[in-house]
Amino acid sequence: EEQIEMMYQGFLKQSGVPESQIPPQLVPMVKGMFTNKPFIEGPWMDKYNGKYYLQYACPGAQFNVYADGVYIADSPLGPFSLAKNNPYSYSPGGFMPGAGHGSTMWDKHGNLWHTSTMRISVNQQFERRVGIWPAGFDKDGELFCNQRYGDWPRVVSSEKNDPWENPKWYLLSSGKPASASSFVEGKSPFLATEENAQNWWQADSAESGQWLEVDLEKAMDVYAIQINFADDKLDVPVPGEIKGTMTQPRYIDEYDRVTRWILEGSVDGENYFVIEDKSQVDTDLPHDLVVREEGLQARYIKLTILEVPFEQKPCISGLRVFGIGDGEKPEVPSFEATRSDDELDLLVNIQGENAVGYNILWGHEPEKLYHSWLVFLDRDKIYSKERIEKRIGALVKGQKYYVRVDAFNENGITEGVVIPL
């Protein structure tokens, strides 16, 4: 109690808030933040077929395992019971992991969607983006969210969609060679194809015309290119008064910034054609998606950056190319799955062939593999028979589970077999 009181008083001093301004009924809640007791935040509730689904965020926005859980009740005030399908929103792998502090809503076509925040957390602890994934209720009324390939483009039509439909286009750029006009030491072009939003290529100059190019190693059918800009220790003079509190100072920039670039493609590396020209736009999109439904043939994808906000050295965390390869899909992977002694962790050992990565799926019934972890092979291990291991701390003690491992590459997805854990 003494330690909690000290931390509480330190919080008041740091935030500049007199204790007299905190309503007495809220003091226990504020002090609760400094205990080891778990707490929930970001509550959201949906009603479906007479049941109430209380969703909440598990604290830890800076971690890849940031997630949303769900409780179910017959009344909006409870009593609530923990759903079997927890954590309901959980996307710990891939280019940009994290899926916590979210909301669930219907669109006008009857599709259910879940939005949550995704982690970057490099420049600041709460540096995040917002993701959106297909969700739904199964025949037993269980709420689910499909995040199997959660940061890949997916087709959305103006009608009822299948929330479990696999991606139409596959990732072509993972681990592929990259080159650039220049780069800062430790921020090489290769980082733009590493599938990790916490790393990025950075040009060593803020001069307009810096470029980044990805080599797919052979001409492929390209349907979409995702351009992900990053911030790198921005040092920008603040032109006005900084407001907020000591713990959350902020200045709202009302100036219209722009992000301008030209995207080109080439089959031979000598003759280039323009895919998208945004040299004159008035928009500032840090994450942009260029789609070509008809497809195009390209081996080289080149991004020339003309302008970014605050005249910074441009950074790209992912120049991600999606399409369909002309080779074979991966082999069905072999794997072993065991459970830790405390029943909270899933231990998976995988060996496959001709894969870029694997998707580990698990759930409490064989046909309800609602949870997933997307795993990429290291650049020098792609397509090899390298054995990989993954420890997943996301099981509910005492609950039965089933596991499946799928393999994927630029040519497609190969589903594995389901085994009991």
PLM features: residue spans?
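Beta-propeller fold recognition
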Residues: E1-Q14, V122-L172
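Aromatic, loop-rich ligand-recognition surfaces of beta-strand-rich domains
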Residues: E195-V274, L285-E343, L347, E353-A355, ...
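Beta-propeller blade signature
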Residues: D68-P76, V130-D138, E264
